[in-house]
């Protein structure tokens, strides 16, 4: 009879392997949970850059190019480009003046209102000027300052959800928050800024004469939808933006206050 040699398996080794696999699963679950929490926390923050600019300003094309680069680098970035009108009548020697086709007196007023408030950074009425979340101002072509401001934004005070509406040409906007948040911001305006996604303009006069300028997120209107209610969530129906258009919904009393919340239309 042939002898059979048995090779005992270490129970300790088995348990050690199971333990290691269990630990690995725990670590993976923990990492997933942390990632989910980070995503949730990130969604509580918003990054909105408002660029005040003009086709009549020779320093502005650099800021407009930077805005395009920032949008290409960060698909979650909210941006609104406001063209002021105070350059329209300025004569630049023999080049004359140029009336910016996107300029509006109300956008110049918005910039002035911002600078009545206590903006951090470099406040004042000038172009190009970038305002981040209605709290921080800097030169619109200063990538370093803008990037720093965009990485230190405040959490949203309310939640704005923008979804497809009941019909194919509408959007549904719902603004929610805790009872405390709604009470704190009761009466604050809820507005929608509509914009052209991009456009190129041939400038025929002023400091940028003979230049072809490409702009992004060019604001065409800023309209109040309603106010924050202390008692209920707020809901609105919007006309869906056309092709090469978009919109941003924001909670802000006026430009003398910060932007408390913002979200883009899908």
Q: Could you say what each language-model-derived stretch is?
A:
Residues 98-127, 135-266:
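Short, conserved sequence motifs used for protein processing/export or organelle targeting and
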Residues 3-26:
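Bacterial N-terminal signal peptides that target proteins for export
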Residues 76-109:
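Thiol-based oxidoreductase modules, predominantly thioredoxin-like and allied folds used
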Residues 33-35:
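N-terminal signal peptide c-region/cleavage motif recognized by signal peptidases
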Residues 29-30:
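Cleavable N-terminal signal peptides of Sec/SRP-targeted secreted and luminal proteins
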Residues 41-73, 77-84, 89:
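Local sequence-structure signature of Cys/Sec-based thiol-disulfide redox active-site neighborhoods
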Residues 65-66, 94-96, 145-146:
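Short, glycine/charged-enriched secondary-structure capping and boundary segments
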């Amino acid at each position: 009879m042939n002898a059979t040699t048995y090779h005992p398996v270490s129970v300790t080794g088995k348990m050690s392997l199971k333990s290691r696999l269990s630990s690995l699963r725990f670590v993976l679950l923990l990492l997933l949970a942390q990632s989910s929490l980070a995503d949730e926390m990130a969604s509580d923050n918003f990054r909105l850059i408002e660029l005040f600019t003009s086709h009549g300003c020779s320093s502005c094309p650099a800021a407009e190019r930077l805005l395009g680069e920032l949008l290409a680098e960060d698909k979650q970035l909210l941006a609104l480009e406001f063209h002021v009108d105070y350059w329209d009548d300025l004569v630049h020697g023999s080049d004359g003046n140029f009336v910016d086709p996107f300029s509006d007196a109300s956008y110049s007023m918005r910039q002035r209102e911002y600078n009545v408030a206590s903006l951090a950074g470099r406040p004042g009425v000038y172009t190009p000027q970038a305002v981040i979340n209605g709290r921080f101002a800097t030169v619109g072509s200063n990538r370093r300052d803008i990037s720093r401001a965009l990485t230190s934004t405040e959490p949203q005070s309310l939640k704005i959800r923008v979804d497809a509406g009941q019909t194919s040409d509408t959007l549904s906007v719902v603004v929610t928050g805790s009872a405390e948040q709604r009470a704190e911001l009761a009466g604050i305006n809820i507005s929608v800024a509509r914009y052209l996604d991009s456009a190129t303009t041939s400038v025929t006069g002023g400091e940028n004469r003979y230049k072809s300028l490409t702009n992004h997120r060019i604001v065409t209107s800023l309209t109040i939808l309603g106010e924050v209610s202390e008692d209920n969530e707020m809901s609105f129906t919007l006309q869906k933006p056309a092709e090469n258009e978009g919109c941003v919904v924001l909670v802000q009393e006026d430009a003398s206050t910060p932007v408390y919340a913002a979200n883009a239309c899908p």
